[in-house]
Amino acid sequence: MASSSPATVIVEMDEPYVQAILLRAFGKYGSLINTQTAQEHGSANSTGSSSSSRKLMHWREYEKIDWDSVHRSTSVFANAYCIRKGLIRKAQMAFNIRLYTAKHPESVLKRGVPETWIFELDDIDYLDEALMECYEVEEGMRHNEDVEDPALRQQFILKPSLTGRGAGIYVFDTRERLEELLEKEFESDDEQEDEDAEEDESGLQTSGGGMLSSCQAVSQIREWVIQRYINRPLLLKSHGERKFHIRTYVLAAGDLTVFVYRHMLALFAPHPYKQSAGDLDDHGAHLTNTCLQAKLDGFDESKAVDLFWNLDLPREKLDHIFDQICRILGDTFSAVSSESTSFQTWANCIEQFGFDFLVDEDCNAYMLEANAYPDFKQTGENLKFVVEGFMAASVATAAEKLLLDANDVSQDVQKMMDHDRNDLVEVFARKNKRSW
């Protein structure tokens, strides 16, 4: 019998796919954890303050977490950090990494992140001024004017700083193409603003932990990053020589320990990749995001996602890629956690992130971006066990470190938690961190 009243966890996720997995993961703890939906709890904003000894955890969408209660009480927990724009906002993360590598030139981030420029533009008429801050990009486009072979051109990729799910991403290699892309974005922005003014005067709507939804005009903030495009990606004959990226699930816990979940995913583009091809509008060859692929004709989930460890590569190469990913992630969290204005960790919070990596033909791994509240459903039904395993590992971490008292944990429960956390690999632990 438990020596204290059980902790309560309120699970309220918008995606039924995730909600069901979480309820099952918490349900394994039986009477040790009182798991409820928001409806069952009786109030979406309840803090459980009626019992001072009771522990309460919000496992919810970011916008639904009662941040006041999480901040006030050490016995109220959350599945997200309140401030983490330094990680999930592409421009802010690029800025933090730039600061970090200036102080730590030996860091793996000097090589493990594509060359990145922060690009801000309020009006297309000021493109010249904006490009002055991205001199190397302008030089690359000027160089390309005299290069007829697309394979020999310098290529770049434009990404909105705030959006997720592949929205608003374009590959370009000339000034003319960049202008066309930006003009289209500014036009769609104006149209969307007119619609939003009629529907909602409150401003930006968000989803996925503060990110703009993919259906919105992606340039409302008018902040992008430009990255040097990795135009020689690793291609596998067993997968039709299609470009792919690696989705890595990461758990950040407390203040601050970071774990990588070993079972990573490989997400493939639907069309074969040909470096010599000049069609940069062929998203089916260049972009690997399954949210975009689902809109294309002939989308086949079984061909879009595979297990990283099942890829047709020698084991030593897979191990080499995984080791790079772990080291890159360790230094990434070291970089962002040193900038407290844009990334603050609380001892009573944990958070799941999805990181995307690309591997080049020489098996060098590059971190592309980080996503809060990753789109777990893109894993699909065939590989659902990967999400289930990561959720079980995350729940076990929350149970052991936050929710359960040591004298309430039997040997069987401890074995279950150890088993569920077995595939978490620690990649970073902040020095002088506050205790759980």
Predicted regions span which residues?
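Short acidic (Asp/Glu) and glycine-rich catalytic loops that position anionic groups and cofactors
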Residues: 71-75, 309, 368-376
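C-terminal active-site "lid" helix and adjoining low-complexity regulatory extension at the edge
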Residues: 359-436
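Amphipathic alpha-helical protein-protein interaction segments
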Residues: 11-16, 79-87, 106, 168-171, ...
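Conserved N-proximal alpha/beta basic substrate-recognition cap immediately N-terminal to
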Residues: 3, 10-164, 171-184
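Hydrophobic residue at the +6 position relative to the catalytic HRD Asp in the kinase catalytic loop
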Residues: 355-357
